[in-house]
Amino acid sequence: MARKTKDLAEAYPAACEAAKCKAVQPFVGALTRAVDAGAELTFVRLNGNSKELFNGRVDGKGAAAIASALTGTGTVEELDLSYNRIDDDGAWAIAQMLAKSPAMRRLDLRGNEIGPEGAARIADALASTGSSDDDDDAASTSCSLESLRMDGNPLGDDGLIALAHALRTNVSLRELNVGDCDAGIKGVTAVCVAIFEDNDTLRSLGMENPRLFTHQCEHVFHAARMLAASGVRSLRLGKWKIDSSGIETLAGYGVGASECLECLDLRCNAICEVGARSVARIIEEGETLRYLNLERNKLCDAGAVAIALALPNATRLEEIDMRSCDIDDDGICALADGIAATEPSRRPRVVRLWGNKFGELGRRRWHRLIAQSAEVGCPIACDFVITPMDATHGAEEHMDVARLDVPDDVAVNAWDAV
């Protein structure tokens, strides 16, 4: 029988005693408040960067006690243990809990100390589909996780290979983030190949900042092939060392062939003004593309011009991020002209350009574009604000530009959009 919140509150002290660890007070408080209110606990958020846990982060033993108490839960759907000190032993306990807690849907383990062995245990849980002929028993020994974040853990190639193996049989997972995990080309290739060959249920994939030493961009080919054949809608490939050749491969074999890609994050790569022609192709041929992040690629003016010419042909692009792309005033003007030439209803509603060089002409073009878009009922939210400054001492009126945060309710969140 599935455990209720009252059962969890009764089980946790014994679990702490068995694990020989102190109780995590924010968890105790959440359980107590729910029981006192006669309510059921549906989420547990124990982020180690929070004020309550900053100086007392959850370690492996603490995670084991929490996992033991949550095993078999019928109410808790989300568990956030990000930015703690959970090791492989803690991950093993969490994996055992996952295999016996079909109510659990979202697990956040970002920024911990989980290595290849712990990743393999989590992968085993993801691969579990029930092994009993009895329906009730099978349901209690299967993992129904939909979202898994393990970015910022030292998983290595072996950890990603284990998770890739699980993806071949898992049918519940919709979101996976394994970025910044000390993995190399073997690990990222294994994940891409597994999705390409055997997985059509994953929707969001993050694999940023792998340890790559190749100059051939063969890893990009595997990502492109995966995009073309899978149901992935959101893909994060930041710091993948994608150059002009790599972006050409991604555009021609991946985005152009994908029927569902909505969010593509290519920040901090090596895409230059030559590669911008392929970016323009992505904008024109990505019929479902809503979000494109090109932050910190050296596109320069020529790259900005190529992208600007493609913008009127974009189908669904809602947000474009080109911060710190070495764009001078000519490129800034070209981007304003490109959006102005786009039908108002199809213009991006969020544009990020801070970190580039706004000249006086570029400021005036963008000031006019922002005002005109607002007048026709299609406002553009930018990460900068342009303000006319009154002329003084006979000087000509000029425009001032300053940084501005884009409101959360306006921005397209690349991770939650799917």
Predicted segments, located by residue:
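Leucine-rich tandem repeat or coiled-coil scaffolds
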Residues: 1-418
